[in-house]
Amino acid sequence: MEADFAVELGPQDETLELPWSAGEEGPRYYDLKRQPELLLEIEEARAWPELGEFLAAVNASPNLLETAKCDAWATSEINPEEEIFGAACKFGSYVDLLFSPWASRFSFMEHEQLVKRITQLLKRVPEIPAAAELIIRRCFYHATGGVEDGFYLTFYLFGYGDDEAQARQRWGIALKLVENAIRQIAAGVNA
């Protein structure tokens, strides 16, 4: 599996407001760490069970992370750097990840250590036509006392194949490998 990380903290880069909402009737933030039953409210988790399993695992109590947002999709648009997979199709997803410990959300060093550790573990997994990228971004945490400027991670994952079914299957396998890497890191932190 290809695995890499990046830092995007410029003024034009993506940010996250937490909690977030797309309007009264639209999608919104659900605190799955503290209310796991709300997983049933997330359309993407219902549409793609593999993503639902990943969200449940990441938000499980002993884990050091929790999720804020997600999506998944299939496309036949292959970027030049993805041509190495020799695929006609890709299935992709993103999940926005937050540290569960409040203080860790404001530590760039902890975010950087985490993305380095995850990418190191993923580079050791068996060869699979998949690519993961973790991006450190700015998050604005809205709390009772105002807004605090911190960080979060966007985790992109793509599986590649000759058709959508094969690409999705490879994406699902890669998603389990990432889940296992996060569990290993969490086990080391909680030991």
Describe the residue ranges of each PLM region.
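Compositionally biased, low-structure terminal segments
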Residues: 6, 30-31, 100, 107-109
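Short, structured coil/loop segments at alpha-helix boundaries
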Residues: 41-55, 101-111, 163-164
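Short, flexible beta-strand-to-coil junctions
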Residues: 72-73, 98-103, 158-162
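Short glycine-rich, basic-tinged beta-strand/loop micro-motifs
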Residues: 85-104, 151-155
